[in-house]
Amino acid sequence: MIVEYLDTLSPVGKLIPSVGRERAEVKTWEALADGLLDASLLARLEATWAGRSDAERSQAWIDRQLGKVHAALRAMSQGLADKSYCVGIHLSLADIAVGCALGYLDFRFPQIDWRSLYPNLTKLHEKLMQRASFADTVPA
């Protein structure tokens, strides 16, 4: 909601198309990235929750969530195909959402080797990392 409000304040450089098919596509990509983040966060919480003993942790739950992460990565890779951006020919909220999701995987799940599995996502992520807005906000 915040990004949608902020997007209305600028007459140029819209991150979300105002109407039509492209708007639906951007929102679909955003939902896909959000789903990846939801599943990865659930897996992370289950694996690291301080209030639980190892016996109380559910590896099956973690595996289920990571399966969702991998399914989302496959869907993103298929949707991106050989395009430069997720939707259209310019940066949109779709690209930002995907870039943030991939960055979170790098930060919390370095064992997920999405770069070698999905070179087109790697290419998009590298392009996004050339932007100061991405490069300056990488977690330390």
Where are the language model's segments positioned?
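GST-like domain detector, emphasizing the conserved glutathione-binding G-site
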Residues: 1-63
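Short, hydrophobic secondary-structure boundary micro-motifs
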Residues: 13-18, 85-89, 114-115, 135-139
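Short helix-capping/linker segments at secondary-structure and domain boundaries
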Residues: 48-52, 105-114
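Amphipathic alpha-helical packing segments from all-alpha helical-bundle domains
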Residues: 61-80
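C-terminal end-helix/capping segment
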Residues: 116-137
